[in-house]
């Protein structure tokens, strides 16, 4: 057990984990983990574990009705983002996240919620009935092709077990008709302290919290007369088991081989022996994944991707999984290729060079983990406690793990690793295959699969060979430049350099993480500078470049050259900018700069990588139209650009217009002049460090530049003006009406005030729709609502509402969408809604100030278009009033541009 965690168990069986942590400061995580889930339902309760989770937010002993949500939103803790829960097959976990701790009463209220979630749910008849509609709409929203396939696959992979019978969301007939007592029976039978753990991690006093937990749960009795929670598992196969599921809306095929194993006995769970075994299994999976990645880069490969992992299949049962995503029509071939690679691993294992690379990666990742042990987020630490309670995962602490890895990893021999790899493959796997229902898909029959498995040991396979890897990224370094000027920008807290070649460099050093440097280089132009006929190639250019390697390395060679380094660099071409983003550890900072240098100076043309990429994209798109949501999203895209000729839908026709020549030409043009870019660095990087200065002057200052500068071209791709409606129907498996409503104005100037008023309008309407559409009408699982302002190519304000519902309810819900908008225009927002959203925005802002990613975004916005969040955000939020919200929304709606896109089921 991590010595930083206070761990204990009360006489009634309640487990608790308490940890002081200040990431972020004055915030805390409160979780209650229940070791119960859908697996414990009886047939007449199918879906009620999940239903019960919903009811926890609909009244408890100390918080009537929506009292939990109302109180915590008043202190900036948002429903959905910070107040939430999930139910799975074997567990249910509730949480209050990022709870402020500056007032003792808030902490006490959070613990009281944990108490009520433990043993004091109200479960009132009228609240149960009101929630039935919400659950049905969640069922509708989640019943996608992948979910339907998963449910059927569970039944075929684990026949005769509880895992075959329970899918969490449950049976709609049960949801509609269950008697109240059925829900209460499940609750009283399984919710008890002996099945529960309280997890509190954050800026709190551990002794005080422990005393409060003991006092709150002192009189909560252990469950009586229900016995211990039964542990259901799945069966071993006495012969290979084949499960095949197809779906009309599936967008691709997937093949999985599952090799089941008994979990280690309880005496070994959480021990050093188990930890060591997990490390070795992880090394095996990493090496096999590396092989799969290399194979997938061959344009002749039968699959677009493959991978493996080792994990829990069910309680008491682990499994090793090999997975492949076949190219359409080559499913049988892909299965055989997957089997071939698994047998190759089983027979010959791996080479020393393969092992050395993954050991280096493991050591460096653990070093970073150790270095950042004091800057880990509360939520991350809380989740470790949940996994310890629910699954028995070891939790020894960063100090122990780092010392153990340093001592043991060098002693892990190739023989040991290969013995573990060999043991992962046995003759009786489960083979699970899913795919679309259409001509041209070549899903192998059960007979073919069984025959291939039987012949596995007769495959002609050669042992892998050792290889030498070139690790020198740049063969000839450029001529070093100089720092031409340097100044400190007080209003944004950044150091600004201009290099001798004209490149602008911005630094904001932080200590939020102990070993992280973030980079972002950006320039105006992007796709707006590209000719219409080149747009298909331009939209895929950065992806093609990334798959092609860089300099004298192809993608596989580059991955091997970077083994053990904690570095990532990616070029992007967006609508109005071109960018390179990156991250690295402190010691790999120069490697990040070298990769950036190569992406500017030596992008690599690789015909084979291009063919592989196009084949992968075509495979993704082969069944795109099977999903009715594709037509829905395409319709929205066309409406947003007034059917401009520059609107490129992501489909097979678009890919046919892509050429490698044009992709390379566009990329080189977009990144032709580094002096047109601003480079932002945030994190553990000190501009006063001579080593940093030398590296920047060499790898940025050494690039060739010009005096040319580019801007953004306005192609007048505006929303279709006026009031527009596009209602249409499509065949679909789950009867659903999908709806998008969007208000747009081009008359509102871009200011911080307008930007934040638009944001808070979206937040307030989200609350209104939660109450009216979800809770009162039971009409939708949720309405996604988003208010925004865009700067380029010209200022634009927008308000988006999107939701799914029963087609029979669509007309009424659409009325409510517009009614809520008009109510705010007429009467202004409710004072409580406005205050809680302002509180939430300021709370989020305070937390964001301690994140490197946020500062990188702040500096991007400041140097791209002059918005200063550090100086202006807080006063702008404080200045928001009911009148400013009312006026902003009225101005938006008065522009007269609103469209509705609605897709109904065809029948």
Regions flagged by a language model, labelled:
Residues 191, 671-672:
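Flexible, low-complexity linker/tail segments at the boundary of structured domains
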Residues 127-182, 186-194, 199-201, 206-213, ...:
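Hydrophobic, small-residue-rich alpha-helical packing segments that form membrane-like cores
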Residues 55-63, 67:
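Metal-associated gating/positioning segment near the N- to mid-region
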Residues 71, 120-123, 127-128, 412-416, ...:
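Peptidyl-prolyl cis-trans isomerase
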Residues 48-56, 284, 541:
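Active-site His/Glu-centered metal-binding helix of metallohydrolases
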Residues 1-18, 205-279, 284-293, 297, ...:
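Proteolytic maturation boundary segments
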Residues 19, 24-41, 48-49, 66-116, ...:
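M16 family metallopeptidases and their MPP-like homologs
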């Amino acid at each position: 057990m991590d010595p930083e965690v206070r761990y204990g168990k009360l006489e009634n069986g309640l487990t608790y984990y308490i940890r002081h942590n200040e990431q972020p400061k004055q915030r805390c995580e409160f979780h209650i983990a229940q070791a119960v889930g859908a697996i414990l339902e009886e047939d007449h309760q199918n879906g009620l574990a999940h239903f019960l989770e919903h009811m926890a937010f609909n009244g408890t002993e100390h918080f009537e009705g929506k009292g939990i949500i109302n109180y915590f939103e008043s202190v900036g803790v948002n429903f959905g983002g910070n107040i939430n829960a999930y139910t799975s097959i074997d567990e249910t976990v509730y949480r209050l996240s990022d709870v402020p701790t500056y007032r003792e009463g808030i902490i006490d209220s959070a613990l009281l919620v944990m108490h009520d979630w433990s043993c004091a749910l109200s479960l009132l008849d009228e609240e149960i009935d009101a929630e039935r509609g919400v659950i049905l709409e969640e069922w509708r929203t989640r019943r996608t092709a992948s979910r339907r396939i998963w449910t059927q696959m569970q039944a075929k992979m684990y026949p005769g077990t509880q895992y075959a019978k329970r899918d969490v969301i449950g049976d709609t007939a049960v949801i509609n008709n269950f008697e109240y007592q059925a829900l209460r029976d499940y609750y009283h039978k399984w919710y008890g302290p002996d099945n529960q753990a309280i997890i509190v991690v954050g800026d709190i006093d551990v002794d005080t919290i422990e005393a409060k937990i003991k006092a709150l749960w002192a009189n909560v009795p252990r469950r009586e007369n229900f016995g211990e929670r039964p542990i259901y598992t799945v069966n071993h196969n006495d012969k290979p088991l084949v499960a095949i599921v197809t779906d009309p809306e599936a967008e691709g095929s997937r093949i999985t081989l599952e090799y089941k194993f008994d979990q280690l006995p309880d005496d070994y769970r959480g021990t050093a022996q188990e930890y060591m075994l997990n490390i070795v299994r992880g090394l095996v999976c990493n090496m096999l994944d590396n092989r799969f990645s290399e194979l997938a880069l061959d344009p002749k490969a039968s699959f677009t991707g493959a991978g493996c992992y080792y994990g829990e299949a069910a309680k008491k049962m682990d499994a090793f999984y090999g997975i492949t995503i076949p190219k359409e029509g080559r499913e049988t071939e892909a299965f055989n290729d997957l089997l071939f690679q698994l047998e190759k691993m089983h027979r010959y294992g791996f080479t020393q060079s393969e092992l050395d690379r993954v050991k280096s990666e493991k050591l460096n990742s653990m070093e970073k983990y150790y270095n950042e042990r004091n800057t880990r987020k509360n939520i991350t630490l809380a989740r470790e406690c949940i996994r310890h309670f629910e699954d028995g995962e070891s939790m020894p602490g960063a100090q122990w793990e780092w010392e153990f890895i340093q001592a043991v990893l060098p002693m892990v021999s190739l023989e040991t690793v290969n013995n573990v790899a060999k043991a992962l493959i046995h003759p009786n796997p489960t083979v699970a295959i899913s795919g679309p229902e259409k001509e041209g898909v070549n899903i192998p029959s059960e007979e073919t699969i069984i025959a291939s498995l039987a012949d596995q040991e007769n495959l002609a396979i050669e042992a892998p060979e050792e290889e030498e890897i070139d690790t020198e990224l740049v063969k000839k370094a450029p001529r070093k430049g100089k720092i031409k000027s340097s100044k400190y920008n007080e209003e944004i807290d950044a150091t600004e350099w201009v290099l001798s070649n004209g490149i602008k460099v911005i630094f904001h050093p932080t200590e939020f993480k102990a070993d992280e440097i973030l980079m972002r280089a950006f320039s105006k132009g992007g796709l707006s500078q590209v000719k219409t006929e080149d747009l298909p190639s331009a939209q895929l250019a950065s992806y093609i470049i990334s798959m092609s390697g860089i300099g004298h390395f192809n993608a596989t060679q580059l991955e091997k050259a970077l083994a053990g380094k904690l570095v990532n660099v990616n070029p992007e071409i967006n609508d109005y900018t071109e960018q390179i983003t990156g991250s690295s550890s402190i010691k790999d900072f120069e490697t990040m700069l070298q990769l950036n240098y190569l992406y500017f100076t030596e992008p690599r043309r690789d015909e084979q990588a291009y063919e592989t990429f196009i084949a992968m994209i075509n495979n993704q798109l082969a069944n795109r139209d099977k999903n009715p949501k594709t037509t829905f999203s395409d319709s929205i895209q066309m409406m947003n650009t007034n059917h401009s000729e520059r609107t490129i839908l992501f489909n097979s026709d678009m890919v046919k217009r892509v050429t490698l020549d044009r992709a390379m030409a566009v990329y080189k043009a977009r990144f032709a002049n580094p002096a047109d870019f601003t480079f932002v660095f945030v994190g553990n990087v000190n501009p006063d460090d001579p080593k940093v200065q030398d590296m920047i002057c060499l790898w940025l200052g050494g690039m060739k530049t010009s005096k040319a500068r580019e801007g953004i071209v306005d192609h007048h791709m505006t929303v279709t003006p006026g009031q527009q409606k596009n209602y249409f129907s499509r065949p679909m498996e789950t009867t659903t009406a999908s709806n998008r409503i969007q208000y747009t104005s081009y008359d509102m100037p871009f200011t911080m005030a307008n930007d934040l008023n638009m944001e808070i309008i979206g937040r307030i309407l989200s609350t209104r729709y939660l109450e009216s559409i979800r809770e009162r009408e039971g009409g939708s699982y949720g309405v996604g609502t988003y208010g925004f302002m865009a700067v380029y190519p010209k200022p634009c304000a927008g308000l988006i509402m999107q939701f799914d519902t029963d087609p029979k309810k669509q007309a009424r819900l659409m009325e409510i969408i517009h009614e809520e908008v008009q109510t705010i225009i007429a009467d202004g927002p409710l004072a409580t809604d406005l205050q809680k959203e302002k509180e939430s925005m300021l709370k989020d802002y305070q937390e964001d100030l301690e994140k490197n990613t946020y500062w990188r975004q702040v500096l991007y916005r400041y140097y791209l278009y002059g918005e200063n969040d550090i100086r202006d955000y807080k006063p702008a939020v404080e200045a928001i009033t009911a009148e400013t919200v009312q006026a902003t929304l009225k101005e938006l709606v008065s522009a007269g541009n609103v469209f509705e896109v609605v897709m109904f089921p065809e029948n």
